[in-house]
A protein has these predicted regions:
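N-proximal low-complexity "stem/linker" segments adjacent to membrane-targeting elements
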Residues: 1-24
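Short, acidic, metal-binding catalytic loop of nucleotide-sugar glycosyltransferases
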Residues: 23-32
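Short beta-strand/loop segment that forms part of the nucleotide-sugar
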Residues: 32-41, 62-64
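A conserved acidic beta->alpha catalytic loop
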Residues: 38-47, 96
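Glycine-rich, basic loop-to-helix element that forms the pyrophosphate-binding segment
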Residues: 64-81
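Short beta-strand-to-loop acidic/aromatic patch adjacent to the donor-nucleotide binding site
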Residues: 85-96
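A short, conserved acidic/glycine-rich loop-to-beta-strand motif
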Residues: 112-121
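C-terminal catalytic/acceptor-binding lobe
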Residues: 149-152, 156-241
Length: 241
């Protein structure tokens, strides 16, 4: 498809994971641009981003003097989206792309609204994850991420708003054949961030009894996995493998 996707990635340190995400992203088939917003990383990570930008691996690069966290950071980066794109994909910087067709598979399974890799079934409500989150650009523009919820509840609220407008929100449960999310690589700044103490009852109310659709798995066996990459070695060491 000729659909152009604006991929937005926030970076806060985590040098090896960030490097791995952007380098493995290069195998992606399809029409996309990569917009990176650096949330006040260390010098080493900033230099890496400049190097990857100069190599053409990053299309648009912004350095923030403070850590804008998740909601505000994505909203700032969104303003840089090309006029040509009609979808936005929020992608974490601790990802291992493991299939060149991951983006095309997402586009093929997408219906107007949201398609996300990863489902969170923990209380208070079954919802999609936010580390690989594809959304209609006009819907993102309409709602943005609510900056009163600086971290993940902003993604939860956005999907509830999209569901309440009558659009689809779909989550792919097993996406291990497409990409892997390492998780927790950018530190603990989220713990004291605004909106983290949101009451479960409020979150349930957002959804208005509307539910996401769950896709068990998207079949595609063009799987490419480099177990020896530095990021995979670091991850396995942390997990004691």
């Amino acid at each position: 498809s000729d659909t152009m996707v604006s991929i937005i990635m926030l970076v806060h340190g985590a040098y090896e994971y960030t490097k791995n995400t952007i380098e493995t992203l290069q195998m992606t088939k399809g029409n996309y641009e990569l917009i990176v917003l650096d949330n006040d990383s260390d010098c080493k990570t900033k230099k890496l981003l400049l190097k990857l930008f100069n190599k053409g691996m990053i299309d648009k690069l912004v350095f923030s003097k403070t850590n804008t966290l998740f909601a505000k950071g994505n909203n700032i980066a969104f303003k840089l989206c090309s006029d040509k794109s009609d979808k936005v994909l929020l992608l974490n910087s601790d990802i291992d792309i493991r299939n060149p067709y991951w983006l095309q598979e997402m586009l093929e399974n997408y219906e107007k609204g949201i398609l996300s890799l990863g489902v969170c079934e923990k209380p208070p409500y079954v919802r999609v994850d936010g580390y690989c989150f594809l959304i209609d650009k006009k819907l993102y523009e309409k709602y943005r991420l609510d900056e009163n919820f600086e971290w993940w509840w902003s993604i939860t609220k956005l999907q509830a708003q999209v569901l309440n407008e009558g659009y689809k929100v779909k989550g792919v449960k097993d996406h291990s054949n497409l990409l892997f999310h390492y998780g927790g690589a950018s530190g603990n700044d989220f713990q004291n961030s605004k909106g983290m103490q949101t009451d479960d009852k409020d979150i349930i109310k957002w959804f208005n009894e509307k539910n996401i659709d769950i896709i068990d798995k998207i079949d595609n066996d063009n799987y490419i996995f480099n177990s020896k990459s530095k990021a995979n070695r670091i991850y396995n060491k942390l997990k004691g493998r």
